[in-house]
Amino acid sequence: MDKIHAMQLFIKVAELESFSRAADFFALPKGSVSRQIQALEHQLGTQLLQRTTRRVKLTPEGMTYYQRAKDVLSNLSELDGLFQQDATSISGKLRIDIPPGIAKSLLLPRLSEFLYLHPGIELELSSHDRPVDILHDGFDCVIRTGALPEDGVIARPLGKLTMVNCASPHYLTRFGYPQSPDDLTSHAIVRYTPHLGVHPLGFEVASVNGVQWFKSGGMLTVNSSENYLTAGLAGLGIIQIPRIAVREALRAGRLIEVLPGYRAEPLSLSLVYPQRRELSRRVNLFMQWLAGVMKEYLD
């Protein structure tokens, strides 16, 4: 059995949760992939995958082996370029996840700089409002807002995002400018929640005494940050959003800031990555570059 090839097959089966899809990826018969994984499990003396009729899931032992196997293959890739000091010679794949608003307004406009410096690196970019499972889904690093991450990962604080309250000119012409949070009962607030069915607390205001919540009007709740911004631009209500996500709209006059003295608490931003023994050089390079780019826009 080719141990390295078996590890590659195992990793792909784990990530795709399917023997068939992994076999298609490698252009191999499904039976061949299954036999090699079984041989790997027999050699290790433990079950790595839990097989059902619909999907394949990692066992606890499989999760541990998955992470170590990823490290081994990453280190082998690094070893190929060990004596090549030129950063342009570094190659390999990076899988990252960044919130949609940050990816659209900050990362993607600057990403060509990194790819130009490191043409051998292939990037897989994921953007979700809901947190991804860093370990299970095989991410090298992610940008997280708010709450601290789960076990098995390391969080590197990057800074805070300033929040602003804003609405479209059309909305303000129709409903007027609120002068204080107490006025919001007669205004429409677009509400955001990652999970529909969970009623948001209301309009958030940070103060020296902590966060305060004010009652407000409004009939729209969304679970997508992209739709949240679009709703604000469409005049459906006031939104509370990171300034970086609306800076162009504010400059162009498509949104206008309201209640500047009553902003929500700044949003903490962290760079999160798996707790491995040693990060690959390409992961380190990307995280250093990303932290430098983010620094320009954080408080």
UniProtKB/Swiss-Prot annotation:
Pfam families: HTH_1 (PF00126), LysR_substrate (PF03466). Keywords: DNA-binding, Transcription, Transcription regulation. Residues 1-59 form the HTH lysR-type domain. One of its GO terms (molecular function) is sequence-specific DNA binding. This is Uncharacterized HTH-type transcriptional regulator YhjC. One of its GO terms (biological process) is DNA-templated transcription. Residues 19-38 bind DNA. Belongs to the LysR transcriptional regulatory family. The gene is yhjC. PROSITE patterns: HTH_LYSR.
